[in-house]
Regions:
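Membrane-interface coil-to-helix junctions
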Residues: 20-114, 130-153, 267-341, 374-384, ...
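Transmembrane-helix signature of polytopic, membrane-embedded enzymes
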Residues: 115-134, 172-175
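Hydrophobic alpha-helical transmembrane segments
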Residues: 97-111, 337-352, 407-416, 518-527
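Polar, glycine-rich mid-to-C-terminal structural blocks
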Residues: 223-283
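Active-site-proximal, structured, solvent-exposed surfaces of multi-pass membrane proteins
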Residues: 347, 672, 681, 721-847
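Transmembrane signal-anchor helices characteristic of membrane glycosylation enzymes that use polyprenol
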Residues: 10-46, 231-245, 370-374, 466-471, ...
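Extracytoplasmic/lumenal acceptor-recognition loop(s) of multi-pass membrane glycoenzymes
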Residues: 54, 65, 69-72, 78-79, ...
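Contiguous transmembrane helix-bundle modules in multi-pass membrane proteins
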Residues: 129, 145-156, 166-183, 191-193, ...
Length: 847
């Protein structure tokens, strides 16, 4: 009974979080409607073949041919049997709440656990949870369908809470939280977010080290570090299956280093990703003010005409143009919304820089500054280059603007440390805080500054800036039309362009200044509440409640701009993202076991609708196989353009298209159908008579020394009768034998991870398969293992002897079984350590 009474207030806070999460998504969550997300729908299209196979066999294949000619599923459906335990723990943690609702609930609960680890009172911890959880970016990524990122971010605060507890001497609970949430965090499978938060962990550990050195408590520091390290290692090993195969896949994906020596080598990083690609989404330097004023750059890249309030200032003559122009005018290619952490939160953060003392403040400030500087990417390139070239793994991640998740953590945390000190300091306004003013006679001199002065200064630096921006917007932000927009509008006659630009600036200035005033009044209201509490005109608990309501309403309203009820659809709309068309039905009448489809009526390499029904040449995935991407750049994309022109010229008569010369690479990929666009949004499927089929013998195999030679040789070969391979595969493939027209290869059985063929040849030789090569594919000929080689830059090949043979290609990596065994062992060790720790703690308390 005492235990229940002790934890009842915490349980009530948890219940409050669930109510808030439900309320945000009301009424959609009660009506059964769900979000239609691009990334989630794309994932459904890419994963349809996996789903069908799993439902039919109960086994999860590690390969799919649904997109990009074929690729591993390690970063599409990273599901392993060892994760079922973690899945159960995760569901318990978020109380089996429905989709979307539990994301917000987990945000709130995670930061609450962190602040309780920092020894915050419950009401302050609940307030702090709102400040972190309702940061705009966290809701924007829910709307976008970046669910792995959502889950990873939700588990990071409680993971850090374990570290905090350990360094505060609470080793058992520190071990439990660190181990458990490290495992859950890694299972979320968003390495980029985990990697970014390790910067926070690094700075915090340094802060604890400095504190330990000052207090001469290095033994305690070492013990806490060991506890965290062991717990983290167990959490990592529990996820070894996922981590190992992610690492393995990274080496072969766009995130790994290319074997090509590119002409523009300076633009290439050690990871293989180009600097331009990594920094394409870089936050603007002046765009950083969105932390304080969300519409500093207009918000999201949605049509300007959708903003009814702003369109009140629009010249009706330009209305059609405003339907094409975006509301966002920053220098990113596009955005789903800004990073806004709350106006009053920023005041508390600035106040914390002045009144919070100790190494932790400097750790949080350093992490914040680093986050902002790195988010600028190409706008602060010399600094970005330092990290790309010298910081391990940093160059493996694109969209550098997303590193602002660090600032979104450190700003509310320091803000809450400031508020905690304000409310817990007796007569705070009359008190002082020392200010380091500089050296005097070789000694540092501190000057005592009244706390009310720090509060006033913080108000001026935040609310004052909002007023200055609102009154003089063009002084601080001269550009309200981006350079890209100016280039796009350059074709408009000058007599129309000048008034258009003037009116566009007027509209956007009104959008910006309205939000400036909004942020000002939020800060003003929060400051008034705080001052009333400090003057004892308002009880602290009521002040906290009012600040809770103020910050929740402020950030709720901003988030509703980017994640609102209008975005929810009936479940059936998302569950079947691509309705079967007449074109699909016509292609599906082909009962051949395996062939590919090229959709020229869509954005071929940015959609998975085609993959839902067919095995696509294109697709959508953030980390496709690197060699396939290089083949796209060098051959597939140009051949697509040539195919469009040739087919149009032949008026759709494929027999009149010189397919062998126009698109040989598409032919070797067994592109049997090409979907062409028609007027009125209709499409038509055209059968390609030149596709090479599932496999064929080649008469000649040329060996080369490197990737550049291999890729270049493709254009010089008759790919139906010749092939090129890296010389490292010579032992596996041997020499090709000229065939005499009687060699036959038939596909007998198709599964995503197993292909069975009958091969007949009087001479034997090298068989090329129209299947994408990847380490881990194995082959047997009449039940005996043979080595699989790589030809034509991306395809599989084997050497067979004369006669008739049964060939089986299989993708069932032995590494899955090995890593699963290690994961179960780690589970056992973690469970034993937790049980032992709890028993030890109970005995210690009794003694």
């Amino acid at each position: 009974m005492k235990t229940l009474k002790r934890f009842l207030p915490d349980l009530l806070v948890v219940l409050l979080f669930a109510v808030i999460a439900f309320a945000y998504f009301f009424p959609a969550d009660t009506e059964g409607r769900i979000l239609y997300r691009h990334d989630s729908s794309a994932g459904r299209g890419a994963g349809e073949e996996l789903t069908e196979y799993y439902q039919r066999t109960g086994d999860m294949p590690r390969w799919t041919n649904a997109l990009f000619g074929g690729m591993p599923t390690y970063q599409m459906a990273p599901s392993y049997h060892s994760q079922e335990v973690l899945n159960g723990v995760g569901k318990f943690y978020h109380l089996w709440l429905p989709e979307n609702v539990w994301y917000v609930f987990a945000y709130l609960l995670g930061f609450y656990i962190l602040l309780r680890a920092f020894d915050f009172r419950r009401e302050l911890a609940a307030l702090g949870s709102i400040l972190w959880a309702f940061s705009s970016y966290f809701f924007i990524i829910i709307a976008a369908g970046h669910i792995w990122k959502v889950i990873a971010l939700a588990y990071l605060p409680p993971m850090i809470a374990g570290i905090v507890l350990a360094y505060r001497g609470k080793y058992v609970w520190g071990f439990v939280l660190t181990g458990l949430f490290t495992a859950l965090e890694i299972q979320a499978n968003h390495v980029q977010m985990t990697y970014y938060y390790l910067f926070i962990v690094l700075f915090m550990v340094i802060a604890y080290l400095v504190e330990a050195l000052r207090q001469k408590q290095m033994a305690r520091f070492a013990k806490a570090t060991a506890v965290c390290a062991v717990a983290a290692v167990l959490g990592v090993v529990i996820n070894l299956s996922n981590l190992y195969h992610t690492w393995q896949y990274t080496q072969e994906s766009m995130r790994g280093k290319s074997e090509l020596v590119k002409k523009n080598a300076a633009n290439q990083t050690s990871s293989g990703l180009d600097r331009d690609y990594i920094t394409q989404w870089s936050y603007g330097v002046d765009e950083t003010w969105t932390l304080l004023v969300p519409n500093t750059k207009g918000g999201a890249s949605v049509p300007l005409a959708q903003n009814e309030k702003a369109m009140e200032k629009a010249n009706p003559e330009f209305y059609q143009i405003y339907q094409q122009l975006g509301q966002y005018w920053g220098n990113q290619p596009g955005t789903s919304g800004p990073v806004y952490v709350g106006a009053f939160v920023m005041l508390l953060f600035v106040l914390g820089l002045f009144i919070v003392k100790g190494p932790m403040k400097w750790a949080l400030l350093a992490a914040t500054v680093l986050s902002v500087l790195l988010s600028w990417g190409r706008n602060f390139m010399w600094f970005t280059d330092l990290f790309l070239d010298y910081v391990p793994m940093y160059a493996k991640f694109r969209t550098v603007a997303s590193i602002l998740v660090i600032a979104e953590f450190t700003i509310p945390l320091l803000a809450m440390l400031a508020l905690k000190k304000v409310l817990e300091t007796e007569n705070f306004l009359k008190g002082t805080t020392p200010l380091l003013v500089g050296p005097a006679s070789h000694r540092l001199v501190c000057r005592e500054v009244k706390n009310r002065s720090w509060l006033v200064l913080s108000f001026v630096l935040t609310a004052g800036m909002c007023v200055a921006f609102a009154i003089m917007p063009t002084v601080f932000f001269p550009d309200f039309v981006s350079n890209a927009e100016l280039r796009a509008l350059a074709s408009i006659p000058s007599e129309y362009l000048t008034p258009l630009i003037s009116n566009l600036r007027e509209i956007r200035i009104s959008i910006f200044t309205a939000d400036c005033w909004r942020s000002f009044f939020v800060i003003l209201a929060g400051t008034v509440i705080l001052v009333l509490a400090l003057l004892k005109k308002l009880q602290p608990k009521y002040a906290v409640a009012l600040l809770f309501a103020l910050c929740l309403v402020d950030m709720w309203q901003v988030n509703k701009r980017y994640l609102n009820d209008a975005m929810f659809v009936e479940r059936s709309v998302r569950e079947t993202p691509q309705q079967e068309t007449a074109t699909d039905r016509q292609i599906l009448q082909d009962t051949s076991l395996d062939y590919r489809v090229l959709n020229l009526a869509s954005n071929t390499f940015n959609e998975n609708e085609t993959s839902y029904y067919h095995k696509s040449i294109g697709g959508y995935h953030a980390a496709k196989l690197r060699r396939y991407q290089e083949l796209i750049d060098e051959y597939i994309a140009p051949e697509m353009q040539q195919a469009m022109s040739a087919i149009a010229k032949a008026q759709g008569d494929m027999t009149s298209v010189p397919g062998d010369s126009v698109y040989p690479v598409l032919n070797m990929l067994n592109t049997k159908y090409i979907i062409m666009p028609l007027q009125g949004g209709q499409t038509v499927p055209l059968q390609n008579p030149y596709a090479y089929g599932n496999a064929w013998f080649v008469d000649r195999l040329q060996y080369v020394d490197n990737a550049n030679q291999e890729l270049d040789a493709i254009k010089q070969l008759d790919l139906h009768h010749e092939a090129v391979a890296d010389s490292k595969f010579k032992a596996a493939l041997g020499e090709a034998v000229k065939q005499e027209g009687t060699a036959i290869v038939n596909l007998d059985k198709y599964e995503p991870n197993e292909l069975q063929y009958t091969v007949q040849s009087p001479k034997g030789g090298v068989v090329v398969f129209s299947e994408i090569y990847y380490p881990g594919w194995t082959a047997t000929v009449d039940g005996k293992d043979v080595e699989v080689g790589r030809v034509n830059y991306v395809l599989r090949a084997i050497n067979v002897k004369p006669g008739e043979h049964k060939v089986v290609l299989t993708f069932k990596p032995a590494s899955v079984k090995n890593t699963e065994t290690a994961a179960y062992a780690a589970y056992l060790l973690l469970a034993l350590a937790i049980i032992g720790g709890v028993v030890f703690e109970m005995k210690r308390k009794k003694e």
